[in-house]
Amino acid sequence: MPIRSTTAALLLAATAAAGLTAAAALPASASTSPAGYYKLLIRVATDAPVMCLQPADPAGGAGTAVVQQPCAAVQAQNWAPLSISGTSYRFLNQASGLCMDVAGGAASGTPADQWPCNSISNERWSWPHSFPDSFWPIRSQVAGSTSYCLDVPGASTQAGLGVQIYRCNNTAAQAWAIAGPVT
């Protein structure tokens, strides 16, 4: 089966399991954010489970790690892409009301966490594709650099593992799907 067909089948199965509906792709533009909340999905290998991002403690505050967990129909796994400009977004968590953030400077291994939404580069992410779409890197814009991508350490399938930024390397550990919108 071609890669795109496999990808489409995977997204359809994951969105159904997580309580999402299929939606037409919306073009990303400088002035428009896609409406609603979406799931940020990762699958590090063809035989690996699909995982979704959420705060480690959905009731946790600023500084709570962003981790991968099995996808479920819970608000903690819902993220609204908020347009900044062009292909730059902040990802706002529905349960916490906080944005996905890089906990420090631009260096491989820097953990992702959540923080009150603001205009600093630690919360800027590049997604130059339509919503929903599948299996592309989400690039951090911390410190003005786009050399670091959202990454699952060691391409692990461990539930509860914190995600990080890591130098972009075109591996499955950095291939994200954005599925939704959530209903």
Please place each PLM-identified region on the residue numbering.
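Secretory targeting and sorting signals
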Residues: 1-30
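Extracellular glycan-recognition/adhesion modules and their associated mucin-like linkers
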Residues: 31-61, 78-106, 124-156, 175-183
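Short, tandemly repeated low-complexity microdomains enriched for cysteine and small residues
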Residues: 60-80, 107-120, 124-126, 157-171
